[in-house]
Amino acid sequence: MKLNEIRDNEGATKNRMRVGRGIGSGKGKTGGRGVKGQKARTGVSIKGFEGGQMPLHRRLPKRGFNNIHAHDLNEVNLGRVQAAVDAGKLDANAPVTVDALVKAGIIARARDGVKLLGVGELTAKLSFEVTRASKSAVEAVEKAGGSVTTTFAAGVAHRGASEGAVASA
């Protein structure tokens, strides 16, 4: 037996049934749809339609709203930053900025900024330049001998700042 001769066992796969291909197939003529009526026609399915009964999405009350002023921040835990320093992905002597976190692979891309959270151990002396930081994160960084500076630049201004340009907000 060779790799190019490997096949599925007999009966392991089943061919797709093609409907409407002659009465001898057993699924010809009406193609398994019964006779006439709304459900026999094409394009019958209207999403959420319940035959005239008030549909579920209209029976339930509206709730909440989308805040257009909300800041979409990346959350970064101190434990992940320490792991990146240990792995050599982050330079302990350079300030930890949004750009540095993206290059280290800790965050995929900069959204509206970064919030530093105090989960995990931090032993390296680091200086952070982030959008926000929790109290526990600030305490842990200062205990390790580092510092935290918070700056905020929204949207396009933030992207410009992360590319080396000066943010004017």
Swiss-Prot record:
Residues 21-35 have a biased composition (Gly residues). Keywords: Ribonucleoprotein, Ribosomal protein, RNA-binding, rRNA-binding. GO terms for molecular function: rRNA binding; structural constituent of ribosome. One of its GO terms (cellular component) is cytosolic large ribosomal subunit. Residues 1-13 have a biased composition (Basic and acidic residues). Residues 1-40 are annotated as: Disordered. One of its GO terms (biological process) is translation. It comes from the Bacteria. The keyword rRNA-binding applies. Belongs to the universal ribosomal protein uL15 family. HAMAP family: Ribosomal_uL15. Binds to the 23S rRNA. Part of the 50S ribosomal subunit. This is Large ribosomal subunit protein uL15.
